[in-house]
Amino acid sequence: MEALSDLACREIKMESHSPQDSKDLNVKPVKLERLGMSSSPPRLTIDCGDTGRSPVPSHMEPPGGARVPYPMHLYPYPYAYSNPMYGEGALPAPDRHLPPTQQHPMFQPQVLGPMTSERPHSNGIDPPRKQRRERTTFTRAQLDVLETLFSRTRYPDIFMREEVAMKINLPESRVQVWFKNRRAKCRQQQQQQQNGPNSNNTTNKPRPAKKKTPPPTPRENDAPTTTSSDTPPFKASPSVSSSMPNNNSIWSPASIAPQPMSSDHLAANMSNNSCMQHSYTMPNAQPAAGYTAQGYQSPYFGAGLDYLSHMPQFPGSINHQMAASAMNNGPMTTMASQLPPPHHAHMPMGAMSSAECIDGKEQPQWKFQSL
């Protein structure tokens, strides 16, 4: 097959040339070993035309083409050295015995780096980053010249900027940027001046002092928890109980001048108070009298009296004193003359309470009169 193709090529070339050309043209068959290929298949197609023409692979050749010898390690994949399937260095080096005319440029081995398909630079060095612009430091003389021009105009034209730039030995772009920043600073100062009085009034205005709320006044139910500093201490002497003055209460129907009372009157008032309290069925009768005697002028005789329920019992003279002050503060003083003769002034507490109960049981008609 190869011999027939070689002969056909020679005959075509000899017929196309003249006899003089045929003498000069000495066509000899080319051995496959010199081309770097063996005689075993597969084989490539060859173009029978001009010998200086570069070989073309079979997949780019029109159908019916002739076979051409070409190294197999470059045929199936033109960029075999960068093919990730084979890896780096897995393929043999290209055959250097082929003449340069038979090495097609698209089949030239490309020595690429490992990341050349992703990076634009084949040397593996990243492009230099954009350097940060250096800040310009103005001297005092430069600032004086710029401030002088700014006082004349805030928007200098290109000619004025160039003139000033030459004077202070700076580029014109730096002068332009300085004017831009200076205008922004001026606007900021104007805004602060406009908002200055308002902001100063709001920030420097003293905070209103917190009003100290007075302590809550004790209610009438809480009155037993407080003590009166004007209340004289109790003394178990009959002279004090008989001569103790009484404070007129604003709740009494008529203010009556205090009068000295004897022990008999005190006993009568005590019995009257106990009977009246039994008729009204008010608990804690005796502490009510003591509660009024301490100076708490209140019309409520039975409210909040548990405070005095744990107090020790006082002698008879103190009971007489508390009973007298309680009766003088209320309208019940008018009932003292209507009662029967009282018991002895120094009667014990137990006997007095039993006598009170007896008096309350023996005189039902008096109860209705007191109401």
Curated annotation (Swiss-Prot):
Residues 131-190 bind DNA. InterPro entries: HD, Homeobox_CS, Homeodomain-like_sf. Keywords: Developmental protein, DNA-binding, Homeobox, Nucleus. May play a role in activation of the SPEC2A gene, binds to the TAATCC motif with high specificity. May have additional functions in the developing embryos. SUPFAM superfamilies: Homeodomain-like (SSF46689). This is Homeobox protein OTX. GO terms for molecular function: DNA-binding transcription factor activity, RNA polymerase II-specific; RNA polymerase II cis-regulatory region sequence-specific DNA binding. The gene is OTX. Belongs to the paired homeobox family. Bicoid subfamily. GO terms for biological process: regulation of transcription by RNA polymerase II. Residues 1-63, 182-269 are annotated as: Disordered. One of its GO terms (cellular component) is nucleus. Residues 8-34 have a biased composition (Basic and acidic residues). PROSITE patterns: HOMEOBOX_1 (PS00027), HOMEOBOX_2 (PS50071). The keyword Transmembrane does not apply. Residues 188-206, 224-249 have a biased composition (Low complexity). Its main location: nucleus.
